[in-house]
Amino acid sequence: IRQRPILLMGPPGIGKTQIMQQIAEETGVGLVSYTLTHHTRQSALGLPVIVDRTAAGRQYRATEYTMSEIIASVYEQMEKTRLKTGILFLDEINCVSETLMPAILQMLQNKTFGVHALPEGWMIAAAGNPPRYNQSARSFDMATLDRVRGIDLGPSLAVWQDYAAAHGVHP
């Protein structure tokens, strides 16, 4: 069964990133976190390079792409931690530029950026803020929502009180 990416939506400061960190720690998997507003199409897909090729006995030149900075970071994390499974967490997913959105949709659907795939054993989680909290945020269309399992987060006084009591927080 193919795991659909998880999409956490909620106001700024609600703890979306901390939730992913806690899940990774408690399950013993790796975590690579990226804020997508800091990326361009090139850093997500990789940079073009010209390579020499041969086909049907003829030489020609073609364009290939270096590995995505994001995918490369996952492999670096795997090497550093020796963990073969993990979560690629894409934050502020609904604030990316229009030129990057097709690559993001490809990642959500196929677990690839360009021609480079997310390693087996890694899943995608993403987060965003509803547009009412961020002028740069946009609502997702149905094509995007069909690719993810959405979870809406909101503040809860009871949850905060339980957390505060467990961690010695008091006025």
Where does each model-flagged region fall?
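AAA+ P-loop NTPase catalytic core and its hallmark functional loops
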Residues: 1-171
